[in-house]
Amino acid sequence: MVRITMEDGGIIDIELNEEVAPITCENFKKLVKEGFRGPIYCTKSTEELCSILLPDSAHIQEGEAEYANRKGMRAGKKIVEPLFTVDDAARALHLFKLRSFGEAFNVVPGVTVTFRVAGHILGSAFVEMSVNEGDKKTRLIFTGDIGQPNQPIIEDPAVAGGADFIITESTYGNRIHEAYDKEGELANIINDTVERGGNVIIPAFAVGRTQVLLYYFQKLQAEGKIPEIPIYVDSPMANRATQITMTNPEEYDEEARALYAMQGRRLVSMHNLRFTATVQESMAINEIPGSKIVISASGMADAGRILHHLKHNLWREDSSIVFAGYQAEGTIGRRLIEGIKRIKIMGEDIRVNAKIYNMKGFSAHADKQQLLAWYSSMKEVPKAFFVTHGELDAAMELADSLGRNLGTATYIPHFGDCAEIHGTEWQMHESEMVQVEPAAIDLRAYMRGMEHDYLLQRSKIEQIVARNPDKAVMVRKKLEKLHKYMDDILKDL
């Protein structure tokens, strides 16, 4: 959120989101539900993707609220309202205003915004903002998710000229992508499964991952590296997202554009590719003899049609289940890649006999080295980086690396922090926009005191060990006990 105080005392709030994703969609609908009626600026493909994601997630919210109320009424509980409705989604979509990449436009007087290619998923952009306040000018960049370079289909992240302040993501701020031949591994999995007579089942995110997989399958088939067995995309949302991807060639990279032109304005053209629409068509897939590839949502295998395909294939020793995306803690996908032997799906207890693969080379996120390289390519170093949008350990490591490599200030915001910026000068304080309970304020102050004490103890320990290295092992053991004790007493919060 950017709050701009005008010279006449007026206040303008600007909400910034860089791409279409479930949490971003929920933000849009929540704002609209609470009365927001201003413009929502986005790229063409983002608007098209939102047109399927917003109503779909609203429909899920309504269904969950209806289910909760059916149970709750019997127990005498209060009526639950959905967080947002299909009507809220429709109202949000009417507020969308399209802007092209590279097009500078005024959101309010004195504030100019430009979308640049972020290279994460179709339509994703990082935001360059210029704010003019009298004789002071401030340039900001809001990165959102920056994409991993050399992904199929979409362009690499555009090079930014620089800014006074950068609000950066840190999703992979402490990780480096493993470099390996993922096309070769994918081909080996398919060939081995076909040789056994089984099916390849791939839980995949509807937006981005499904389209990348189709691109790879087409390439592997054209090179004769995999057989032309039936390929099914069994997800209504993935079907529509794929259609949107196929009709936005202006966002393709050079290789994809050449392929699109060569194939008669079709990015993916495989005679063995089928898109299923109805539930009946989906269920019929498992009755078709012979090996096949099935791509279905959800990507973490917690809901959707993929459950039906897992139910029919997990017990088969000849089938393979291939995960090509992050699997969150507690999801079916996570339990399968961790080696669970039996799992309940759709009310049925199933033995896991299929081969389980966890391919790690498909992330659309730039890793730590790629983020550092992207920032190093800028002509100017910012006055400060505000490191956000990541787990604390990832944010801390990226902030440390940015400071050491670029020699600039870094700050990891806490909940309720406000960065007040005037031109190129900045200071942090607690925001008046966030209502915080007094007990929470006291707790925050106490924890900051703990952080101060920790730094003093750390400095003391480092000095002791520097004078007497033999004590390092003993100190490490004491710290490990302290760490375990803290984990134990805080784990049930």
Describe each region flagged by the PLM.
Residues 1-32:
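Start-of-domain signal
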Residues 6, 121-122, 205-212, 299-303, ...:
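Gly/Ser/Thr-rich loops at beta-strand to alpha-helix junctions
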Residues 9-11, 35-36, 192-201, 227, ...:
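Short, surface-exposed connector motifs at secondary-structure boundaries
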Residues 35-212, 216-234, 251-258:
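His/Asp/Glu-rich metal-coordinating catalytic cores
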Residues 50-52, 151-152, 176-178, 241-243, ...:
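Short, charged, surface-exposed secondary-structure boundary motifs
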Residues 137-143, 149, 169-177, 203-204, ...:
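Acidic/glycine-enriched edge-of-secondary-structure segments
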Residues 219-222, 269-493:
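C-terminal regulatory/interaction regions
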Residues 233-252, 415-428:
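Long, charge-dense
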